């Protein structure tokens, strides 16, 4: 939902930063790779129990994920390879983050939360897959409750606020796992109906 409504506004806000990045010689590929490295670093920190720091670093990586596309557009350097790399690193970053969460809760001796983390990451990967498949079939694959922006918000705040004794991690894992699979179902049904 936020992906569709807010992406254009966020891109406009990112324009001045993107122009500066382009002037400094930072291309979209470099920005994508730095964002991915931040996501992996954040995931490792989460696994080690530095939840707020890890979530914050993942958030910084997510901001770079917005910036790379804006830089590509402003500099006329949008390519199919860049789009592939961006999507690929986005998915790897999600897997890394949930692996960090699963490791952390496993270390706490909470097997139910480990299982829910696996369920969450599977759903999180299916959401963009269904969009890509729908678009490959010539129909609209966007929409649903938990787009990338919503998934990041729930993950970052749910993980990060746990460090401040707000007990947000367990509810966030449950909420994420349930809502992401609801989104999978939404996208599947919507695509199915368009193919009639």
Spans of features found by a protein language model:
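Conserved G/P- and acidic residue-centered "switch" motifs that form tight phosphate/ATP-binding loops
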Residues: 65, 86, 124
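Glycine-rich active-site/cofactor-binding loop and its immediate structural neighborhood
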Residues: 50-78, 82
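Hydrophobic alpha-helical transmembrane segments
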Residues: 1-62, 96-196
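Basic, amphipathic juxtamembrane/active-site segments
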Residues: 69-115
